[in-house]
Amino acid sequence: MLDILTSHLINPLAYAVPVLIAVAFLTLVERKVLGYMQLRKGPNVMGPRGLLQSVADGVKLFIKEPIRPSMASPILFLTAPVLALILAMMLWAPMPMPYPVLDLNLGILFIMAISSLAVYSILGSGWASNSKYALIGALRAVAQTISYEVSLGLILLSAVIFSGGYTLQTFNTTQEDTWLLLPLWPLAIMWFISTLAETNRAPFDLTEGESELVSGFNVEYAAGPFALFFLAEYSNILLMNTHSTVLFLGASFTPDAPELMTISIATKTAMLSILFLWMRASYPRFRYDQLMHLIWKNFLPITLVLVLWHIALPIALAGLPPQT
């Protein structure tokens, strides 16, 4: 009974709760960083130096009345944000930090499959809101997410060819001597830009184009359901940055001190997250045709050529005698 309780309740909670706390502080860091980049203070009233601002925001959102538009689809309208958060939490299961909740042989494929399902929560929320702005935002989000998943999948395939396995733990072994960032630097740059687009972050935040769509697919949401979407979005940002760290920045595993690996991953993830915020502060929003041009006419041909190169080169050199 205790084993079942530990494996089915305590272990997942021990993973999910720190992620949600990290999300709360990421929102605060974002507001502070953007504030200082725009030569202002950011939140500085709640708690010492504004540290409790995200707690106050969370309490405020969850005690408000969740208002539902009268013409909205009642079941789907409330199910979509819950589905978004559940999928965002499930994505953390195969992450080696240093030990995963689910030790999967195909951990990378699991992450790709579940992140693809997140499209349904966005599409469901946009359609169920019965608002033209929400629907346009949802359709943009779906087109953008599906487009950039193509390049993400091909980049992952190249990285898998280098590491020799679909488990995330094999990447730790592969990168004991050299980070994959060095041999795969063109793919790493494209991966980073694709993760920005995949998580709908600036400069690819066309789904939330305030100037034309008010707030995008979540325009009709308020209170708790809006907070769930918010948590899911920022959890996905942290997840993508953790994934980038494991793939390209060598989360070195030392069996004697696994805590060092957790600290290493957390530090690199935090630095990548601040790079996300820096991008938001620095670049204006892309036009929609530029967004699609970038993936289908630039990233897709380059990633396809590099995948074929990484497959062909080992096969071509396989017949050579061992070099002593």
Swiss-Prot record:
GO terms classed as biological process: aerobic respiration; mitochondrial electron transport, NADH to ubiquinone; mitochondrial respiratory chain complex I assembly
Compartments in which it is found: Mitochondrion inner membrane
A molecular-function term among this protein's GO annotations: NADH dehydrogenase (ubiquinone) activity
Catalytic activity: a ubiquinone + NADH + 5 H(+)(in) = a ubiquinol + NAD(+) + 4 H(+)(out)
Assigned keywords, A-Z: Electron transport, Membrane, Mitochondrion, Mitochondrion inner membrane, NAD, Respiratory chain, Translocase, Transmembrane, Transmembrane helix, Transport, Ubiquinone
EC code(s) of this entry: 7.1.1.2
Listed Pfam families: NADHdh
Residue ranges crossing the lipid bilayer per the database entry: 9-29, 75-95, 106-126, 146-166, 178-198, 212-232, 259-279, 299-319
Main location: mitochondrion
Top EC class, one word: translocase
GO cellular component: mitochondrial inner membrane; respiratory chain complex I
Membrane topology: Multi-pass membrane protein
Superkingdom of origin: Eukaryota
Protein family: Belongs to the complex I subunit 1 family.
Subunit structure: Core subunit of respiratory chain NADH dehydrogenase (Complex I) which is composed of 45 different subunits.
Protein's job: Core subunit of the mitochondrial membrane respiratory chain NADH dehydrogenase (Complex I) which catalyzes electron transfer from NADH through the respiratory chain, using ubiquinone as an electron acceptor. Essential for the catalytic activity and assembly of complex I.
Annotated protein name in UniProt: NADH-ubiquinone oxidoreductase chain 1
Species in which this protein is naturally found: Danio rerio
Gene designation per UniProt: mt-nd1
